[in-house]
A protein has these predicted regions:
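A short alpha-helical cap/connector motif
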Residues: 1-131, 138-159, 163-209
């Protein structure tokens, strides 16, 4: 299901600040070689993440689900001076590709790439985080969410990707895991939230208590 008219998506992309050389190189490689280019952060989404980092003056960022590194690079390029992006990838092959793209970029010193199960690794990380981006196993989103919400800073924002599941959240039992996640966030008294129809759906949540 196309959630947004493809013509509108192309128009939005054409009227968005282009990729930097580093994110462009990673995105181009991903399109040609990954076998699943839709898993990478698209331009509009990457620029939205960069905007959140910029306006929030984020210094500590956590990304769960590195894939080939496009999102991590977009985040690191706009992080505040002295800041760090910690990014977690469970697939060693994806992590290897991400490492090549990160090492070839001018922001490699701002990115810490961890390889392993995010459910275990997140619990070992110290907060607070000014921005958390979830883009990993959708069935584990609630677990990731519960692990990171207590580690958000006072001004911290959590962003979860693909929460509309290509429209499957609207169709009976399909998209069950993401429907459960969306309802979980909506019912959480600790946060306010907004669900955006950007890309495949972005859930933003920020602490109020």
């Amino acid at each position: 299901m196309d959630l947004v008219d493809p013509r509108a998506e192309r128009y939005a992309t054409a009227h968005t600040t282009p990729h930097t050389p580093a994110t462009a190189a990673a995105a181009s490689w991903t399109d040609a070689n990954s076998g699943a280019p839709q898993m990478a952060s698209a331009l509009v989404e990457s620029r939205l993440l960069a905007a959140l980092v910029t306006v929030g003056a984020a210094r500590r960022v956590l990304e769960v689900g590195t894939f080939t590194g496009v999102g991590a690079l977009a985040l690191a390029e706009r992080i505040a001076p002295g800041g760090t992006v910690i990014t977690i990838e469970s697939d060693p092959a994806h992590a290897e590709a991400a490492r090549r793209h990160i090492d070839a970029s001018p922001v490699a010193d701002r990115i810490e790439l961890l390889v392993g199960d995010a459910r275990e690794l997140v619990g070992k990380l110290d907060g607070p985080f000014d921005l958390v981006f979830l883009d990993a196993w959708k069935s584990d989103y609630i677990d990731y969410y519960e692990a990171v919400v207590p580690k958000l800073s006072d001004r911290g924002v959590l962003v979860a990707d693909n929460v509309l599941a290509r429209g499957q959240v609207l169709e009976g039992e399909r998209g069950h895991a993401l429907k459960a996640f969306n309802e979980h966030v909506q019912a959480d008294p600790r946060v306010d939230n907004v669900l955006l129809t950007v890309g495949d759906g972005l859930m933003l949540a920020w602490r109020t208590a």
